[in-house]
From Swiss-Prot:
Residues 1-78 are annotated as: Dimerization. The lineage of its organism: Eukaryota, Metazoa, Chordata, Craniata, Vertebrata. PANTHER family: NUCLEAR RESPIRATORY FACTOR 1 (PTHR20338). Residues 109-307 bind DNA. The gene is nrf1. It holds the Pfam family Nrf1_DNA-bind. Residues 303-488 are annotated as: Required for transcriptional activation. It comes from Danio rerio. This is Nuclear respiratory factor 1.
Length: 514
């Protein structure tokens, strides 16, 4: 019994010794791992996934990239931006350079705020001296922004001039040959040293840029405003030779072309005259509309697209509608007073009859979602009518007597409730622009119910088919009855329920059969 106890005790002692040994091993491994992590922090490059970053070949990896090449050729600031973009691409980050200066400024503010929060968390949790340093070596006022833990932040500020000098020398070594030749004839279009397309320049930027451009174009130190002898031959005839900081055109000219668009025309004319149109459009994506033609029916099918338009108030009181993305001016409105919230010209659908068979051929033209905050109601209706007419003109000509179903999404605008005759006139203009003689307009939903109530046929689920010549009369009647006006689209199989007579014109009340 005693021998068994001794044996068991020895066995337990062996197990305990093994456990202690295992614990020691775990402690050793943990210590080694922690030491390895610290060593990795000390020795690793700025991106731990990569090898030590070699800036001797900084632009070769992106030499074929048009954005980087364009930046590198724009001077020291552009070269610094190109090197930064190349660094991010070498590390396979999924981001791209933002070519729009306004959007780039917003992104800069957002990301700097995010960096500050991350840096504060890092210094507090980890307990290390860390900073964020942002530099743009432009002259004479370079951007040097540093924030982070003290006293490291103050130490870096102390060596600002040395850091800037070393950075400029390093960038000069990588600058492409002949990078400064662009400014020998005309200055490149740049905002804060970064190239920009002329269509993305704001009015304030254009007003500040044009006098500098004139120095290069005319060779004079001052433009000589008001002196016809100093006026360049490329200056637009419809723009007075006067200081561009104010618009002195006639009211008619202001109504026709916005001041921002006129300033862009000045810049374009100058660069075209000097044969440097290549400098006008930096990073511009050439977007072409793809049109597929069906051989059997010869019907043009336009790929649906959504055009977003933003408003810009001009100093002369006009409001320009600028297409987001391209910067092109869609329309210029005369006054900046009341205008409803959102206008969308949505779809134009039509069906034709060929050899006794009904075929549905769709031309979807989703053109121009406009968020408009200020203008007159009459301007709104004219803008909608113009957009719709342009959309219809883009589609194939329709046969006489074809049935068209149209929609003006969200064009209730409290429709006839608020604007009455103006709204009715705009929609009637759309109808007349779309249909040839003998065509029909199909109303649905609430509008159909309203027309049904007017004609004594209260069928809220049906469609109302109205001749083009009578459409404005019907819509005006709805407006006077405080009904929202909407022209609905949905060419589907219908069943005629009733035929009414309205002012001598036949009005058919039909019901959907889906």
């Amino acid at each position: 019994m005693e021998d068994h106890t001794v044996h068991q005790t020895e066995h337990m002692t062996t197990i305990e010794a093994h456990a202690v040994s295992q614990q020691v091993g775990q402690v050793h491994v943990a210590t080694y791992t922690e030491h390895g992590m610290l060593s990795a922090d000390e020795d690793s490059p700025s991106s731990p996934d990569d090898d030590a970053y070699d800036d001797s070949d900084i632009l070769n990896s992106t030499g074929t990239d048009e954005v980087t090449a364009h930046l590198a050729a724009a001077g020291p600031v552009g070269m610094a931006a190109a090197a930064a973009v190349a660094t991010g691409k070498k590390r396979k980050r999924p981001h791209i350079f933002e070519s729009n200066p306004s959007i780039r400024k917003r992104q800069q503010t957002r990301l700097l705020r995010k960096l500050r929060a991350t840096l504060d968390e890092y210094t507090t949790r980890v307990g290390q001296q860390a900073i964020v340093l942002c530099i743009s070596p432009s002259k004479p006022n370079p951007v040097f922004r540093v924030f982070g833990a003290a006293p490291l932040e103050n130490v870096v500020r102390k060596y600002k001039s040395m850091i800037l000098e070393d950075l400029e020398n390093a960038l000069a070594e990588h600058a492409p040959p002949g990078g400064g030749e662009l400014s020998s004839e005309l200055p490149p279009l740049t905002i804060d040293g970064i190239p920009v397309s002329v269509d993305k320049m704001t009015q304030a930027q254009l007003r500040a840029f044009i006098p500098e451009m004139l120095k290069y174009s005319t060779g004079r130190g001052k433009p000589g405003w008001g002196k016809e002898s100093c006026k360049p031959i490329w200056w637009p005839e419809d723009i007075p030779w006067a200081n561009v900081r104010s618009d002195v055109r006639t009211e008619e000219q202001k109504q026709r072309v916005s001041w921002t668009q006129a300033l862009r025309t000045i810049v374009k004319n100058c660069y075209k005259q000097h044969g440097r149109e290549d400098l006008l459009y930096a990073f511009e994506d050439q977007v072409t509309t793809q049109v597929a033609t069906t051989a059997t029916h010869s019907i043009a099918h336009l790929v649906p697209s959504q055009t977003v338009v933003q408003t810009i108030s001009n100093p002369d009181g006009t409001v320009s509608l600028i297409q987001v993305g391209t910067g092109a001016t869609v329309a210029t409105l005369a006054d900046a007073s009341e205008l409803p919230g959102t206008v969308t010209v949505a779809q134009v659908n039509y069906s034709t009859v060929t050899d006794g068979e009904v075929e549905q051929n769709w031309a979807t033209l989703q053109g121009g979602e406009m968020t408009i905050q200020t203008t007159q109601a009459s301007e709104a209706t004219q803008a909608v009518a113009s957009l719709a007419e342009a959309a219809v003109a883009a589609s194939q000509e329709m046969q006489t007597g074809a049935t068209v179903t149209m929609a003006l999404n969200r064009y209730s605008l409290e429709g006839a409730l608020k604007f009455g005759e103006a709204a009715a006139h705009a929609v009637a203009t759309l109808a007349e622009a779309t249909l040839q003689g003998g065509g029909q307009i199909v109303l649905a939903g609430e509008t159909a119910a309203a027309v049904g109530a007017l004609t004594g046929v209260p069928d809220g689920s049906g469609l109302v088919q109205i001749p083009v010549s009578m459409y404005q009369t019907v819509v005006t009647s709805l407006a006077q009855g405080n009904r929202p006006v909407q022209v609905a689209m949905a060419p589907v199989t219908t069943r005629i329920d009733n035929t009414m007579t309205l002012d001598g014109q036949a009005v058919e009340v039909v019901t959907l059969e889906q």
